[in-house]
Amino acid sequence: MISNKKSYAMKMLQLALALSLLHYNPDYLLHRWDSQLELGTHGDGWELEMLRTVHRLDMDHNPYGNRKGLSPRIEDLLNFDDPSLGGMANGIGGCKLPPRFNGSTFVMNLHNTTGNSSVQTAALQDVQSTSAAATGGTMVVGTGGAPTSGGQTSGSALGEIHIDTASLDPGNANHSPLHPTSELDTFLTPHALQDQRSIWEQNLADLYDYNDLSLQTSPYANLPLKDGQPQPSNSSHLDLSLAALLHGFTGGSGAPLSTAALNDSTPHPRNLGSVTNNSAGRSDDGEESLYLGRLFGEDEDEDYEGELIGGVANACEVEGLTTDEPFGSNCFANEVEIGDDEEESEIAEVLYKQDVDLGFSLDQEAIINASYASGNSAATNVKSKPEDETKSSDPSISESSGFKDTDVNAENEASAASVDDIEKLKALEELQQDKDKNNENQLEDITNEWNGIPFTIDNETGEYIRLPLDELLNDVLKLSEFPLQDDLSNDPVASTSQAAAAFNENQAQRIVSETGEDLLSGEGISSKQNRNEAKNKDNDPEKADGDSFSVSDFEELQNSVGSPLFDLDEDAKKELDEMLQSAVPSYHHPHPHHGHPHAHPHSHHHASMHHAHAHHAAAAAAAHQRAVQQANYGGGVGVGVGVGVGVGSGTGSAFQRQPAAGGFHHGHHQGRMPRLNRSVSMERLQDFATYFSPIPSMVGGVSDMSPYPHHYPGYSYQASPSNGAPGTPGQHGQYGSGANATLQPPPPPPPPHHAAMLHHPNAALGDICPTGQPHYGHNLGSAVTSSMHLTNSSHEADGAAAAAAAYKVEHDLMYYGNTSSDINQTDGFINSIFTDEDLHLMDMNESFCRMVDNSTSNNSSVLGLPSSGHVSNGSGSSAQLGAGNPHGNQANGASGGVGSMSGSAVGAGATGMTADLLASGGAGAQGGADRLDASSDSAVSSMGSERVPSLSDGEWGEGSDSAQDYHQGKYGGPYDFSYNNNSRLSTATRQPPVAQKKHQLYGKRDPHKQTPSALPPTAPPAAATAVQSQSIKYEYDAGYASSGMASGGISEPGAMGPALSKDYHHHQPYGMGASGSAFSGDYTVRPSPRTSQDLVQLNHTYSLPQGSGSLPRPQARDKKPLVATKTASKGASAGNSSSVGGNSSNLEEEHLTRDEKRARSLNIPISVPDIINLPMDEFNERLSKYDLSENQLSLIRDIRRRGKNKVAAQNCRKRKLDQILTLEDEVNAVVKRKTQLNQDRDHLESERKRISNKFAMLHRHVFQYLRDPEGNPCSPADYSLQQAADGSVYLLPREKSEGNNTATAASNAVSSASGGSLNGHVPTQAPMHSHQSHGMQAQHVVGGMSQQQQQQSRLPPHLQQQHHLQSQQQQPGGQQQQQHRKE
């Protein structure tokens, strides 16, 4: 995957460089090229496929011709001589130039080549003057906002000169003489042109210029970068503005307006901030122009522009940028715009104004920010544009007054209040709605295949790497993992580049300042969110209706989108969409979208972007989370619709684009797994059965899917009322019931990918995750895993139901819900089906195990069949999924997770509990004790709080030594539930490692440990209550009431809130704690010790990425601590970890061994290592230095004794091991010897046979030539060859008498032959007896030898041993033949 990415990056880079060398406008070429490229839908990873040959006229006819086998050729891109281009180029007959191109390309090339800004300036002037003079076209080089012909061009400080060839066309009515170049001077000012960017940034910029980075609207914009660092929402390079993308798809804008600066420092040419105007009107441009226009987010069509503006403005709003801020003429004053028509001028002006409004300044930094925000500003511009149009296009307005949308109640940035934002959003929404009718056209217009294609920039090489889906997902997980910290710099969209990072920080500041309010409201919901919600309220009716974005709309949108991305097959689309969903910080802003995804199309569209911005704050995150929950989950119309629409929350959004079809699999799963999203558990069960190869592929092979939740938990199959519209079934908020989601401070948004979504189809779990789980392990797998684990259905959110349900560590993926904890853990579906032995035999995949786990505890429906009421109310958990409660969650969520969560009433919000982590405070979470067997676990470990991995924890499946144990954060955040995290056995869960059968481990609670419901729900260990913030072990005691937990009411035994790891607290920008939301940031709610379910955790880490243990492991646990941990878990963990503060101390203690702790408690002055390791003399000397009490001395001696014993034991074990190894070696040697001897024997056998066969062949050969006295061939049956001692060979007749066998005859012959010698006569073989009755005489065949017969040594006739065979046959004629044969 990486290689593919790099390869792609290299190709693009080479192409960009080649184009640069050719001084050809890469925007044009790449534009055309990009439009022809698509993610490979048939290969591994994302590979570009030439969907079409170069964009030629023929492309128009067969736009999707697949040139997959052919690599793009520059010749294809450079159609200078292609006459068709001339016709296409804005109707400029012989013109080979694209309708417009970026003059800065040339400048850039010159500048880069010469490094002399002056040269660049000259070149620029040259180009400008030449083009202006030659064509008389309107090449507007505007700087500073000085009015140009259109009065609306703003120069880009970076010198983006967009030359519109169409405008240059003499026939172009709009062409106007070049305006004074005073602006050019500004534009060309060396400082502006100086490369103040790193090479990497420059490369990015170049790529952007080449349109190589089609980030402009990538749905993946907010995906975390490869290094796991969240990109800033407008992250320069990855800024695929979802706002724009989604907006465009929703029809909000035909072109992806949210442009992403390649670098924070480099405005993207397509940014509206640096507007490139299409020179020719749409009509003139023809398809290609439209193509380019859309690519650049520009379209002459006024409606289109208005829509774009609205969309962009919305995106801007979403981003949290106040459109009020003057987009600063200063910002992009330097941008050179060559615009030929009024509309474009207006757009430019609007953009300019927006730049001013956004407070962009001309200085490089400002420009960088501006470019970064340009997408936002663009959005603002868009919305302002219509207004702008209404106003005089005089730039002065924008500059002097800081143009403000009339619709939007403009306030100064400082005063931009939630009300202002709300109104702005409303205005934007209105604009969009007004433009909805145009959306269809816009969608048609959207032809940039690259829109929404995610790429990342290699931090090391600066290469642009197209992200493979897996990578995206990982990134998403990373996002989810991205700390929800208050500091926005951790914004999920944080760029990997320093500039981006800086920008993010600025942005965070900006967000706060711009919004003029703390991102987090007291509730923990960002004010913006509140504003959004207010707006949502306004929009709710629409939301409820699904308004303009209905599933059908979504489908239409999908269909209308021409981008190859959207030409993908359904599965691919689904996968992309889901991926997008996960990628987009899932929490699309909570705003209005909850009710209807489209509530603010822009919001969703920009959900990622704007999320990053608007909700940078934790509150924002929370809001997003909520919004996302609603938008994603609830946002969709109903679950089915919601799924399709909700996620996207914008019809156009990628999410919406996903087919509303039944559940989604995580996007990643969409393609690879058949959808198990059946809404009904039974169906899933069927699916499960289908995929149930004991699990390796449990459901598509959890292991296979492990990286991804089966469904977005957010999309839990059950819809929960979206927050926005409680009534709306919108899937249960990803975090919990949508109903409370809105009201309650959203739990911290789940990791961007919605922990809930990932974790649990039932968001409830996800909810929990989200809360604590903003971070997943960096790798997707971890996230998924954690999601799976997270979602054991048993999140609190799952509500008590989940609680009742066995704690379902697993994601509902397979077992869609453990709905009831009532059932004995072992009662689970799988358990029912298989005996323990069978399970043992099974390949317990994590997924399978999880299934088992789920099933075991409750509903036999691993699949989430409702085993108990749980399903029925769908309270938050699998039940929601299965049991056909499409909205089970919603029901729960709406009702607050009402329903008997497996018999325990989940307080309102119980479902939501998880969802909102019980933000609603639904106590219902108490769900059955069963739910958390963990509770018993907790009790056992007592540590829920102190997440000291008990030995069992680490040793257990994973050997807690593993670094993973110590670094839960490595792959996952506190919520990382990947298998690897030992924390999965959070201390609480960390029950002594029961020698459970592995399968039990996986899927089940340890039967030994607890009966699922055996513990009273209220029995959570006290420690459990204490939150161990450090690990989120979702150890919920069954009794923990989710609500208590949510509020940090760890006090409530039932609180199921995951304990966040300390880290987590830092991350909860979502304000878990900050918001004071039900979940205290700490979720003090007890992290209830993980249940065995947690355990389910899967002590096997095989399928998950390392560190993805189902529970996050404590951040830094040393193995030593194992012992200490045990102790800690027993005691301190319970108390200390319960409180966040306690957690930190616990963490410290976790690393301490029991002896260390005791020594510390007794204030022993000698360190434990010294006590153990010092030589006796030195040790005694040290002891003598201190006045130690008897207790201290006793402890010191004990410590030393234990330490020495430990060493001795280790040595003993080592010796034993050495002996074993030695014996093993000896045994191996013996075996080897035996093998060798056998081989030798076999070889000898084979040789013997070979020789025997060879001799037999010789014997036969000789007989063929022998003749009897009559000249007849001798038959071996009648004659035998005998060899004498001297080597002579005799042919002797065999005795035929019955009494004698050949051997006897031969023997007799020998004896007789030995008789005598008859001169010249062959001795008569009288002795031969009657055997030789033939009277045949043995012929002495040795020629030349004396007639005396030598004594013959007779050999068996076959003469097998004979080496020399001399045979002489005496022919009747007395002729002698002597034959010597040697083997």
UniProtKB/Swiss-Prot annotation:
GO CC terms in record: nucleus; polytene chromosome puff
Main location: nucleus
Keywords, ordered alphabetically: Activator, Developmental protein, DNA-binding, Nucleus, Transcription, Transcription regulation
Tissue and organ distribution: Embryonic expression of isoform B is localized to the mandibular segment and the hypopharyngeal and labral primordia first detectable in late blastoderm stages. Embryonic expression of isoforms B and C is ubiquitous.
Positions of the UniProt region annotated as Disordered: 258-286, 376-421, 516-549, 585-626, 717-758, 860-897, 923-1026, 1102-1157, 1297-1383
Subcellular location: Nucleus
Occurrences of domain bZIP (ranges): 1195-1258
Record carries keyword Transcription: yes
Molecular functions per Gene Ontology: DNA-binding transcription activator activity, RNA polymerase II-specific; DNA-binding transcription factor activity; DNA-binding transcription factor activity, RNA polymerase II-specific; protein heterodimerization activity; RNA polymerase II cis-regulatory region sequence-specific DNA binding
Biased amino acid composition, Low complexity: 867-878, 935-945, 1128-1146, 1299-1320, 1346-1383
Basic residues: compositionally biased ranges: 588-616
SMART domains: BRLZ (SM00338)
UniProt superkingdom: Eukaryota
Keyword DNA-binding annotated: yes
Pfam family, one: bZIP_Maf
Residue stretches of biased makeup (Pro residues): 744-753
Biased composition regions of type Basic and acidic residues, renumbered to the chain: 530-546, 1148-1157
Spans annotated as Basic motif: 1197-1234
Compositionally biased region (Polar residues): 260-281, 978-990
Any single biological process term in GO: regulation of bicoid mRNA localization
Region Leucine-zipper, annotated ranges: 1237-1258
Family of the protein in this entry: Belongs to the bZIP family. CNC subfamily.
PANTHER family the record matches: NUCLEAR FACTOR ERYTHROID 2-RELATED FACTOR, SEGMENTATION PROTEIN CAP'N'COLLAR
Role this protein plays: Plays a role in posterior cephalic patterning. Probable subunit of a heterodimeric regulatory protein involved in the control of head morphogenesis. Isoform B may have a repressive effect on Dfd response elements, thereby modifying the activity and specificity of the Hox system and moving the body anterior/posterior axis.
Protein name: Segmentation protein cap'n'collar
Organism of provenance: Drosophila melanogaster (Fruit fly)
